[in-house]
C-alpha cells in the first residue's frame, strides 16, 4: 500500500516508524506503541485514539482466583468482540479483560497474570461451517492444552476463534430452496451459461473456523504460546466417490522456527497462518493483519446471495468448496472450487517452552474457548503428589495412607497409635475365634445342602426340550414359581403393538444354548399376520425353577426388544405370554455369535484368509449403527461385547446385530449394576467410572465399543489377555490402556483410544464413531492391511467360553411336534424313550470331572456338579432311563 492511501504512525519509545514501501508488512501493535495516531487520507488530519491496551492501566486486579474462562463474548462472524460485549459477558465472574479497538489487536482480549507460577492453558479452536447439502455434521475445532510458566503482571493476549458461517439459511429465496432440498445447482443456474466468464455454480459451502491463539510479546514481537486450529468448512455437498477420501489426523507443530504459512485456496479462501498474508478477499487474515475471517466469494453473492464467511481467527471464506480452517499454518481448500471439496483443518501449535498436557483432538462443535487455571507444582513434595487448595491459593502435598501432613506442608508423619498391644491382641483373638465359628457353620450348611442336592438332575437343553415335548403333566406345585395352593400363573396382558403368538403355532426343532433366563431353541412359527409360510425363529423360554422376579425380568426383556426396530438390532417376531411357559420369538441368526465367528475365521499359514480388513470394518460399522440407534433413543446397553453380537449368516452377505438385551444373567437385577455384593460385572468391557463409582452414561457404551473393536481386530481374543479382573481394574484405573492388536491399522487403534478416554465427556458419541469408521473404510492403507496369521490351532482363551454355547447340531426330532397347550404345560416327565425312532442310537456317555470354573467375563464362580451327578448328559458309569431324541 502507498502512503497516498494510508499512513500509519507508530509512536513508541524508540521513535516513529513510517510506512512508505509497497512491500511493507504491518508491524504487530504492542502496548508500548500506544497511543496510535491514524491519518485519514480523505480528511488529511490526525485523530488520536485513546490507549486501552496499556498493561499498567489494565482494570483486572492481581490476586484473583481462577479458573478463568474466556469466550467470544457473544460475537460471531468475521470480526471479533468489542469491549462493551466482553464487559457484559464477563459480568459476575473473576475475568476482567481489555479488548483492542483498532489495528491488529482489534477483538483481541488482554489479560494479566495474577501470580507467578505454572498455569494450565486449554484452548479450543472454532468449528467450520456446514454446507447447503452437507449439513449432517460440521468439521470440529481442535482442542489441546499445555502447561506454561508465567510471571505476575505479565500481559497475555487471547484471540478466541469464532465459528465459520453456515451456508444456510441463504440470502435469497433461490438459495433457501436449495437449503430446503427443493432445488439444486442445475435448476438455480439455468440460463446463466451464456454469461461470459460465469461459472456454472458458485456458493453453498461453509466458512472455515477461526483459530484460538494465546500469545505474548518478546522484544516487541508476538510470540505464540498455544494455537488451537479451527476446523475446515464443509463443501456444498458430500463427495460422491467416498472411496478416495481418507481421515486426516490432527496436526501439531512444536518448532518455534517453523513457518506460519497460510493455506492454499481458489474461489474459496484458505485459512490464515501465524505470519501469512492474505492474497484474496476470501483468504483468512493472520493475527498481524487483524485476524478477520475471509469473505464469501463474489460469484456466490452475485448469483444467489451466498455469503458464508470464515470465522474470526483467520478462517477462510467459502464458495462451493468449504473455507480452510485457521491455525499456526492455515488449512488448504480446493483451488478449482469443487462442489464436494471440504476445507482442511489448520495446524495447531505449542511453544517449546511449554509442556504438552493433552494431545490435540477435534472436539469443538461451535465457537472457540480458552480456560486458564493454576497448575500445582509438586516438586517439593516427598511423593511428588499434591492437590491444589483454592481457598489457601497453594498446593498441599498428599501423604500415603497411615500418615498425615505436618505443619510445614511438606513432611509426612505417622499417625499416633493409641491402642495398647494387649487390646490389639485381644481383638485379633476374638476376630479369629468368630471367623472360625462362622467358617464351621458355613461348611456344615454347605455339606447339608450338597447331600440334599446329590443325585438331583440339573436342567440342560436336552432335558428342557424333552419336557416341552413330553405329554406327561406334573401336578406338583413349584415353590419357586408360585405358592402352594394358589392357582396357575395368570395370563399377562400385552401392551398395544406387540404380536401375540398362539403356542399351537410354535414348533420346536432343536436346542441352541442357554440364555439369560432359560434355554434357547430353534423352531418354526406359523400364523403370523401377513405371512402364511413357516418362519424360522429363535425361541427363548423361562426355566422350570424360576421366581416371580425372573418372570418380571423376562417380561421386561420382551418389552425392551419389542420396542426397537433397526436393521442392526435383533428383531422380535412375537410373544407368547398368555400361558406358561412364556416364550419370546426372535429372528433366527444362523451365523452365530460374533466371537465364535471371528475365532474360527483366523487365517493359518498356507491358507487363504477367509476375511479381509473390509469385512472387519463392516462388522464394526454394523454394531456402531445399532449403538447409534440406541443412543438416539436414550438407551444404555451396558454390555456391548462380541459375545452379545449375532450374525445373520456366516457368508459374505452377513449382517451383524446387537442380540442381547438381557441374555447376560442378572442384567436387569439392581445388583448387576452395583459394585460389590453378588454382582456380575463385565470388568474387561467397563469404563473406570462404572467400576469404581457405579456411574453409567451414554459414554459407557462408547468405552465398551472400543473394547469390541479390539476383539474384532484381534479376531476374537479375550481383552487384556493374561490378566485377572482385579488386575484389569487396577490397570485401567491408573490410566493404562491395551496395546493395539497385531497388524491393527493406526486409524482403527486411534478410534479405540478415543473410546477409552478417562473422562466420559471426552469420548466420542456414536455419530462421531460412525464417521471415523467410514473414513477408515475409505483409506487404502487400512483396507490393504494384512490380517494376523495364526501360527497354531485355535486355543480356548477361557474355559467358560465353552459354557452356554453348546450347539447340539445332531439334536433333531424325527417329526416336528407342534407346541400345543397340553404339552406346553408339561415341565417334567421322563417318557423320552417313546420319541426314539427305530435305528437311532443314544448319546455316547461322557465323563464330567468335578471342578469349579472361573468365568473371566463377569468375575463369578460357576460350579460344576461332582462326578456321577445327573446333569442331563450321560455319564461314564451309568445310563439314563431315557434317551435324547435324534442323536445318532
Curated annotation (Swiss-Prot):
Q: SUPFAM superfamilies from the entry?
A: Protein kinase-like (PK-like)
User: A Pfam family in this protein?
Assistant: ALK_LTK_GRD
Q: What are the boundaries of the signal sequence?
A: 1-16
Q: Where is the Protein kinase domain?
A: 506-782
State the EC number(s): 2.7.10.1
Q: Which InterPro entries match?
A: ALK/LTK-like_GRD, Kinase-like_dom_sf, Prot_kinase_dom, Protein_kinase_ATP_BS, RTK, Ser-Thr/Tyr_kinase_cat_dom, Tyr_kinase_AS, Tyr_kinase_cat_dom
Q: Which reaction does it catalyse?
A: L-tyrosyl-[protein] + ATP = O-phospho-L-tyrosyl-[protein] + ADP + H(+)
Q: What tissue specificity is annotated for this entry?
A: Subsets of lymphoid and neuronal cells.
The alphabetical list of record keywords is: ATP-binding, Cell membrane, Disulfide bond, Endoplasmic reticulum, Glycoprotein, Kinase, Membrane, Nucleotide-binding, Phosphoprotein, Receptor, Signal, Transferase, Transmembrane, Transmembrane helix, Tyrosine-protein kinase
Q: What PANTHER family does the record point to?
A: LEUKOCYTE TYROSINE KINASE RECEPTOR, TYROSINE-PROTEIN KINASE RECEPTOR
Record function comment: Receptor with a tyrosine-protein kinase activity. Following activation by ALKAL1 or ALKAL2 ligands at the cell surface, transduces an extracellular signal into an intracellular response. Ligand-binding to the extracellular domain induces tyrosine kinase activation, leading to activation of the mitogen-activated protein kinase (MAPK) pathway. Phosphorylates almost exclusively at the first tyrosine of the Y-x-x-x-Y-Y motif.
**Recorded family membership:** Belongs to the protein kinase superfamily. Tyr protein kinase family. Insulin receptor subfamily.
Q: Under what name is this protein listed? A: Leukocyte tyrosine kinase receptor
